Design a protein with these regions (language model features):
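Class I SAM-dependent methyltransferase SAM/SAH-binding core
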Residues: 57-116
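Conserved Class I S-adenosyl-L-methionine
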Residues: 6-9, 19, 31, 39, ...
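A generic alpha-to-beta junction signature in SAM-dependent methyltransferases
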Residues: 50-52, 75-76, 149
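A short acidic, Gly/Pro-enriched loop at the edge of an enzyme's catalytic core
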Residues: 114-125
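A short SAM/SAH-binding and catalytic strip from SAM-dependent methyltransferases
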Residues: 124-138, 161
Length: 279
């Protein structure tokens, strides 16, 4: 599908479609390598839990530019991996990279996983690396994913722990607020008890949630990291007058400098590794 393809979405996901098939998706496509590098420390833990076997059929939900989908396909050597996302631009990049990297058993579709008619019991493993937190109606979405999973099939997610436990989010939001009130926000699927109740109601069993804390990479040095962070938060900075904006950028650069290591700029991050199974 192309970026101009009409995507059938649930009304509760119209806002997400506008964002991810628009400016947000364009930024993530432009910066795909950096976003992947940022959470690279989670890769081994994530795929170890997924336990993808050579013949598995894998569904990657919210796949973005498809790094995890391609990685899954490389493990499912006699199987396949399908990545789905709302962003036409990121999926275009995902297809191009799959071709360049020579991954033949991978495909990508621009669909709303909450309502898309996946094949009944068509997948052995459903994975999502920070891509399952945006559904407008989560119960309907996960019920749809249960239906798409074979009996005994597995669900493996990475989701963020609460904001207060993620240094990178709280630091950048506070600095860029520049004295203004920091907008309230809750990260979906950040409460294990709520996530267990949700997945159980959707039809999953054998729920398990494990805390995983990893350093998150933002750039090779202060200049590189500052460009990346400012690009993501440009809207909030543009609301400031010139002097206040300059102070905010200076404060950001100072904080980035405090997190500079010989391997680059890193901040603490905290995720949940969520596992469940279709009975």
């Amino acid at each position: 599908m192309s970026e101009s393809t009409v995507v059938r979405v649930d009304p509760s996901n119209e806002r997400m479609l506008k964002a991810w098939n628009g400016d947000d998706g364009a930024l993530w496509a432009k910066r795909a390598e950096r976003f992947n590098d940022g959470v690279a420390a989670y890769r081994d833990t994530f795929f170890s839990a997924a336990g993808i076997q050579p013949g598995d059929r894998v569904l990657d939900v919210g796949c973005g530019a498809g790094q995890t989908t391609r990685d899954a396909a490389r493990l499912a050597t006699a199987g396949s991996a399908l990545g789905v996302d709302l962003s036409g631009e990121m999926l275009g990049l995902a297809r191009r990279l799959a071709g360049e990297e020579g991954v033949p058993n991978v495909s990508f579709e621009q669909v709303d996983a909450q309502v898309h008619a996946f094949p009944e019991a068509g997948f052995d493993v459903v994975i999502s690396r920070h891509g399952s937190m945006f559904f407008g109606t989560p119960l309907a979405a996960f019920a749809n994913l249960v239906r798409a999973t074979r009996p005994g099939g597995r669900l493996v997610l990475l989701t963020w722990q609460p904001l207060r436990l993620n240094e990178w989010i709280t630091t950048f939001r506070t600095i860029i607020a520049a004295g203004r009130e920091v907008p309230s926000a809750n990260l979906a699927l950040s409460d294990p008890e709520e996530t267990e109740a949700l997945l159980t109601s959707a039809g999953y069993t054998d729920f398990r949630c494990t805390a995983v804390n990893k350093p998150m990479y933002f750039g090779q040095d202060v200049d590189d990291a500052a460009d990346f962070v400012i690009e993501q938060h440009g809207g909030r900075l543009s609301d400031l007058d010139e002097a206040t904006r300059a102070k905010a950028v200076a404060a950001l650069r100072a904080d980035l400098a405090e997190h500079q290591t010989d391997r680059g700029v890193f901040y603490g991050s905290a995720a949940w590794l969520v596992e469940a199974r279709r009975p």
